[in-house]
Amino acid sequence: MLATVMKQLKSHPALIPLFIFIGGGATMSMLYLGRLALKNPDCSWDRKNNPEPWNKLGPNDQYKLFSVNMDYSKLKKDRPDF
């Protein structure tokens, strides 16, 4: 199958950017999905030892991928400890 794809790419070189962008998009989406699965506090893989991982986050912990105008280090703690 890979030989057939390579043969088609050699005969139609205009398809090369299409393969590059689709492959790059698929790679970036898998990396983002992995980041969500490992770093997001809403997702818990170990229910016995850490059933509620969102309770261990402080107000100055950044778990978003991108924040525009927010400086998390200057926030005060306004939540009770559990």
UniProtKB/Swiss-Prot annotation:
Swiss-Prot/TrEMBL keywords: Electron transport, Membrane, Mitochondrion, Mitochondrion inner membrane, Respiratory chain, Transmembrane, Transmembrane helix, Transport
GO cellular component: mitochondrial inner membrane; respiratory chain complex IV
Membrane topology (Mitochondrial matrix): 1-14
Superkingdom classification of source: Eukaryota
Annotated transmembrane regions: 15-37
UniProt-listed InterPro entries: B12D (IPR010530)
Localization: Mitochondrion inner membrane
Main location: mitochondrion
Signal keyword on record: no
Mitochondrial intermembrane side: 38-82
Topology class, membrane: Single-pass membrane protein
Function: Component of the cytochrome c oxidase, the last enzyme in the mitochondrial electron transport chain which drives oxidative phosphorylation. The respiratory chain contains 3 multisubunit complexes succinate dehydrogenase (complex II, CII), ubiquinol-cytochrome c oxidoreductase (cytochrome b-c1 complex, complex III, CIII) and cytochrome c oxidase (complex IV, CIV), that cooperate to transfer electrons derived from NADH and succinate to molecular oxygen, creating an electrochemical gradient over the inner membrane that drives transmembrane transport and the ATP synthase.
Complex and partners: Component of the cytochrome c oxidase (complex IV, CIV), a multisubunit enzyme composed of 14 subunits. The complex is composed of a catalytic core of 3 subunits MT-CO1, MT-CO2 and MT-CO3, encoded in the mitochondrial DNA, and 11 supernumerary subunits COX4I, COX5A, COX5B, COX6A, COX6B, COX6C, COX7A, COX7B, COX7C, COX8 and NDUFA4, which are encoded in the nuclear genome.
Family assignment from sequence similarity: Belongs to the complex IV NDUFA4 subunit family.
Protein known as: Cytochrome c oxidase subunit NDUFA4
Source organism of the structure: Danio rerio
